[in-house]
Amino acid sequence: MLTVEQAEQIAAAIEVPDWVLTKSAALVYSCFGTAADAFESSIKINFPAQHAFVEAWMRARSHPFAVRLPYLNPWHGIASILAYLSLIVTLRLLYRVLGKFSCRTLGLVHNLGLHLLSLYMSLGLMISARAAGYSLWNNAAGTSPAEWRIAKLIWLFYVSKVVEWLDTVIMLLKQNYRQVTFLHVYHHTTVFVLWWLASLVAPGGESYYSAMVNSGVHVFMYGYYFVTLLFPSGIVRDVLSKFKFVITKGQMWQFVFNCLQSTYDLVWVPREELKYSAVLLQILFWYMISLLALFGNFLVKNKNFSHRRRVDAATGSGAKEDTAGRSYGDRTHGTRVKVGITNMQLETLKNEKVAELKRLMHKNGNGNGQKASLEATAGSR
């Protein structure tokens, strides 16, 4: 295990430079600042009391580091969420016009980028927490230089939630609408709000743990997505497919660990000794409960769906025909399998038909040429 001095040296070497925050904020504002400011102005004009209340609440609750962290304007955050939801609706409505995209190159870059970013954030938070002298749980969001380093990583983790919205865009462009579920949209929007709140009120302390664990899970998740895109078929893809539900279970375990953290802080630690915001810990606990319920439901449904597909593949009953008459499902030697009929049953029916035709031909005294013709006709059905 690293000593505090060793951790300090490594943390200082990999620290996010302050100029990254200012330069990235200036770049993003140059692209979207005008629209975001217009949204805030409309809120201020139409809802002056609510706007004033939020501004007063922020001044009273903001952590000292919050003034140094960009993209914490609540109205800009709300505008971002509305833009995200609007984009989902727009891409869903325009699917006929836009067509279907493969998005392979975009997906490779996106998943590899988030894989590397998650690795950096997970290791950075772990080492920086050690350098700051943190214990596992019950840590305060202080104002020391070591904790400013952690605050920047928490802010980077918060901003990465916006980058993850590209997951949804890629799914919609590929027309994988089944993946854009209520769970998917709920998770991507609410986690952004939760980490905006943590970055504003307490960017450090206990927030380091859930950000570190989540980033660690995302290292494997986005790495898995990247490799599956790199190998869309073959042995590697077959091996990776076996780990699909392991990723989901890993996500659920992180929710359990976060629940344990908040339970420890709120129940085990005496309230007068609690070093972090009790309100944020309560929000964390109930949010994790909601995600556990939704992810658990998702896991059960998808396991049942996969089980049905395996059963259908084994029995041959998975094939269907659509309204245009195109058949899809299991095929054997080019034979189209009808609904509810296995390949063996189909072969038996064909043999029975041939036998019946032979019997009729023998009865009527037909020749070998007609017999062969009828056999060929029966065999082609």
What positions do the PLM features span?
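Membrane-helix and juxtamembrane interface regions of eukaryotic multi-pass membrane proteins
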Residues: 2-208, 213, 228, 232, ...
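Acidic, glycine-rich loop-and-strand cores that form catalytic or ligand-binding grooves
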Residues: 216-222
